[in-house]
C-alpha cells in the first residue's frame, strides 16, 4: 500500500516555516517501532526492514515535503521571543483513509534556522523517554502525541556527558502550538494570526467554518480541551515539567515530553524539572499555569475577537476543569453518584497521603479492593497513623453504601480508572541504561507492559520504586 502525504501547512501558511531536509546520523539503525500505531496508519511492514531509511532521515517517502516551523513563546513566564523547531522537522502530513491527517515529525533531525545555540540533535535517552511517556499516556486514555519509531547511531552528541545521537518520529493530528500565534502577534502581524486561526478552524474545527461566530466558538473549545487535558493530568498524577506556551497544543494534546514525571509519593508541590527553581511548573500549579497560557493565547486573538468573548471563555476554564476533575476523582474513589461530602472525603485522603508520603498510584489501586461492609483493607498497612486511616476509611465505606452498588461492580469501575502501572522515572531510566549498552530487551518489555496499565501484575513494574529511583532529577537537556 502506498502512503499518501499532503502539504497543507506548506501550501497555506508559507511564512511559518523554512523548507529543509533532515541531516542523517552516522550508522543510524532502527531499534524500536510502534507496530500497533503502524498498523493504524497502514504503514507497510517492509518499511521497517531498512536499517534507518525514513526513520533516520536518510530518505523521504513520496509526497513528503519537509519543513521546520517557526513559533515563539513564554518560557517560565518570561517572553522568550522567537523559538521554533530547533531540531525537529515536519516530514509531511499523512492523509488517512477516513480523510483525517497525521503529522510525521522527526525529532533530532539536525540543524535548522531555529536551532539558536543548539546542535539540532536529540539523544537516545530523551527519545526513549518520549516514546515511553507518550505511549503510556495514550494507553491511560489521555490525549497525546504518539511515538512511531526510534533510531540510534554512532554520532556523539554532547550534553552533560557524551551520549549517542538518536531520532524519533512523533505523530499527531497537528503540531499547532499556542506559540505559533504568539510569534505573529508580537511581530504585530494580526492578519497572520487570523490566518493561523482560519487554518485551524478549516482543518480541525471544520463544523465552525461557516459560523459567523466561529472564532469565539473555536476559542471556547480550545479552552475546554485544555481544561479537560489538565484535569486528566492531575487525576493520574502526571507532571509535565515545562509548560511553556510553545509546548501547549492547540488541540489539547500532551506535547513535548521533556523533564516529565509521574508522582511516586503523593507530594502536591512535586517539581520534576531540576531547572524549575521557583516551582512554576510544580504538579499542583499546573491548572493555574494552563490558564495563564490560555490568557496569552487569548491576547493574540484580541485584534479580531471581542475581548468580552475571550474573557467569557477564559472564565469558563475553572468550571470545566473542576467538572472533569470531579468526575474522574469520583470514579477513582468508586462513587457512582455525587454527594456533598465527596470533596471533603477526597481532601482528607489527600491530607493523610501527603503527611505519610503515600504512593499515589498504589494507594488508589489498593483502594479499588475495598469491600464496603468490611473494615479490613490491604491499604491500612500502607499508613503509619492507623487511627487516622481507620477513621477516614470508616466514613469512606459509609459513603460507598449510599450508592447501593455491589462491591464487584464498583471494584470493576475503580480498577478501570486506577492504573496499576504508570511510567515511573526509574522504570524509564532502567530501560535507557540497558539501551545505551546495546540491549533493547527492557525497552521493548516496558513498552509492551505500558499497553495494559489497568491490568494487575506481579512484577516490579507495579512495586514501590527503589530508594535510588525516587526523585530522579530530570532536566530539559535532550
Curated annotation (Swiss-Prot):
Q: What is its EC number?
A: 2.7.7.-, 2.7.7.108
Name one matching Pfam family. SelO
Which keywords fit this entry according to its UniProt record? ATP-binding, Magnesium, Manganese, Metal-binding, Nucleotide-binding, Nucleotidyltransferase, Transferase
Reactions that this protein is recorded to catalyse = L-seryl-[protein] + ATP = 3-O-(5'-adenylyl)-L-seryl-[protein] + diphosphate; L-threonyl-[protein] + ATP = 3-O-(5'-adenylyl)-L-threonyl-[protein] + diphosphate; L-tyrosyl-[protein] + ATP = O-(5'-adenylyl)-L-tyrosyl-[protein] + diphosphate; L-histidyl-[protein] + UTP = N(tele)-(5'-uridylyl)-L-histidyl-[protein] + diphosphate
Q: What does this protein do?
A: Nucleotidyltransferase involved in the post-translational modification of proteins. It can catalyze the addition of adenosine monophosphate (AMP) or uridine monophosphate (UMP) to a protein, resulting in modifications known as AMPylation and UMPylation.
The answer on whether this UniProt entry bears the keyword Transferase reads yes
- Cofactor dependency: Mg(2+); Mn(2+)
Name of the protein described by the UniProt record? Protein nucleotidyltransferase YdiU
Active site per the UniProt annotation: 246
Q: Which organism is it from?
A: Escherichia coli (strain SE11)
Q: InterPro entries in the record, alphabetically? A: adnlytase_SelO (IPR054838), SelO (IPR003846)
List ligand-binding residues for ATP.
84, 86-87, 107, 119-120, 170, 177, 256
Q: What class of enzyme is it?
A: transferase
